[in-house]
Amino acid sequence: MKHPRLRDGKRLQTSELYPFNELPDDLLVNIGGYLVHLLYIGRKDISGSDWGDAFADAVGGLHLDSPVGIADVVLGKMAWSMKTVKNANPFKAERVRLISGRCSPDYSYGITDPHKDIQKTGTAVLGIWNERINIAQDNYNPLRTSVLIRSYDLLSYCIYEEENHR
């Protein structure tokens, strides 16, 4: 849906490359071509960094490839956090486990034994994640997580997106 016209004449100064979770065919073809190239040159797996490179190349964005923050690929005011997981059948996967890396309860909250109080550790990890989203949303809107589910034999792939919220 298009942005509404407002009486004060102001508009959100961002444009979405495509509607949420509706990746255009040409984008999927470009991503597929990038992944096929990696397999052709002998790659035995597709890493998270490869996924970020493939997506950035396909959208014409910049892959920050940074171990901190959640904005992995950026294009203008839009950003994506890139995740990749393996699954026996990507097209039938109903649940996947995403790892929220870049979260250190020890560093951020001084929790030296994360198993001592699981509830406290979970609350700490969620607090770190929410703060990372706050920081990313200061610079980017919309902010999405793009997940590549790949089969173990690397012959099947599925992509889906989630909007990042606190």
Question: How should these model regions be labeled?
Answer:
Residues 1-69, 75, 84-166:
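Nucleic-acid endonuclease domains
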Residues 79-81:
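Short hydrophobic-acidic sequence motifs that mark active-site Asp/Glu residues
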